[in-house]
């Protein structure tokens, strides 16, 4: 149980399809869940998938219960851990939105995602859960589940012109800058 190194784009492990978890109560899974929680908190991510810390298993964690400094305009999402998630789009509506990724540091891009999604998975206690999400939470779960299939958000860009360094996109006014209060909160969280 520790903050793990996050693999970055270019590492071939990020391109592999992850294995199904056979036993959610296995000690390896319990330890993995704690590592995901510690790592996503330390890096202020909106979510994290097991392959991003070098574990090729179908486990994702998203949300954190409070505002996320990396996505200040987004609603808070309760922390949710899913094992072997299966996603099904609800309807045919797609929504374009800006994404970043802890495995693609410093870069953002516009990606089209289903606006509403239904998921079915096991929770950390091994019980089957299902839920419907829309908007930003639906985007986050789709992004994290892509990691389970070896897909990174740049693979899904609306167009290559929407992909760039966060600072450059902010300077050009393409995406909003973090407010000074949000920057301060972000810096304080990093110091903790």
UniProtKB/Swiss-Prot annotation:
Top-level taxon of the source organism: Bacteria
One GO term of the biological process aspect: co-translational protein modification
Catalyses which reaction(s): N-terminal N-formyl-L-methionyl-[peptide] + H2O = N-terminal L-methionyl-[peptide] + formate
Catalytic activity, EC: 3.5.1.88
Cofactor note: Binds 1 Fe(2+) ion.
Active site, per annotation: 144
Cofactor(s) listed in the protein's UniProt record: Fe(2+)
Membrane-spanning segments: none
Keywords: Hydrolase, Iron, Metal-binding, Protein biosynthesis
Binding of Fe cation, residues: 101, 143, 147
SUPFAM superfamilies documented for this protein: Peptide deformylase
Enzyme class: hydrolase
Annotated GO MF terms: metal ion binding; peptide deformylase activity
Pfam families: Pep_deformylase
Keyword Hydrolase: yes
Entries under InterPro entries matching the protein: Peptide_deformylase, Peptide_deformylase_sf
CDD domains in UniProt: Pep_deformylase
Cited function: Removes the formyl group from the N-terminal Met of newly synthesized proteins. Requires at least a dipeptide for an efficient rate of reaction. N-terminal L-methionine is a prerequisite for activity but the enzyme has broad specificity at other positions.
PANTHER family for this protein: PEPTIDE DEFORMYLASE, PEPTIDE DEFORMYLASE 1
Family under the similarity heading: Belongs to the polypeptide deformylase family.
HAMAP family: Pep_deformylase (MF_00163)
Protein name in UniProt: Peptide deformylase 1
Organism field: Prochlorococcus marinus (strain MIT 9313)
């Amino acid at each position: 149980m520790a903050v793990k190194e996050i693999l970055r784009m270019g590492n071939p492990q990020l391109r592999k399809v992850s294995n199904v978890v056979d036993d959610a109560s296995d000690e390896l899974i319990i330890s993995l869940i704690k590592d995901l929680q510690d790592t996503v908190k330390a890096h202020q991510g909106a979510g994290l998938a097991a392959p991003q810390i070098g574990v090729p298993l179908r486990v994702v964690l998203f949300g954190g219960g409070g505002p996320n400094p990396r996505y200040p305009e987004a609603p808070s999402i309760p922390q949710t851990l899913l094992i072997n998630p299966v996603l099904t789009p609800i309807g045919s509506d797609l929504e374009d939105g800006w994404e970043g990724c802890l495995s693609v540091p410093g870069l953002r891009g516009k990606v089209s995602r289903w606006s509403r999604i239904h998921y079915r998975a096991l929770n950390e206690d091994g019980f089957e859960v299902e839920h419907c999400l829309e908007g930003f939470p639906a985007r986050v779960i789709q992004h994290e589940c892509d990691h389970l299939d070896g897909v990174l958000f740049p693979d899904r860009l609306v167009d290559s012109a929407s992909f760039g360094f966060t600072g450059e996109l902010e300077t050009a006014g393409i995406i909003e800058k973090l407010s000074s209060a949000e920057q301060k909160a972000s810096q304080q969280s990093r110091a903790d």
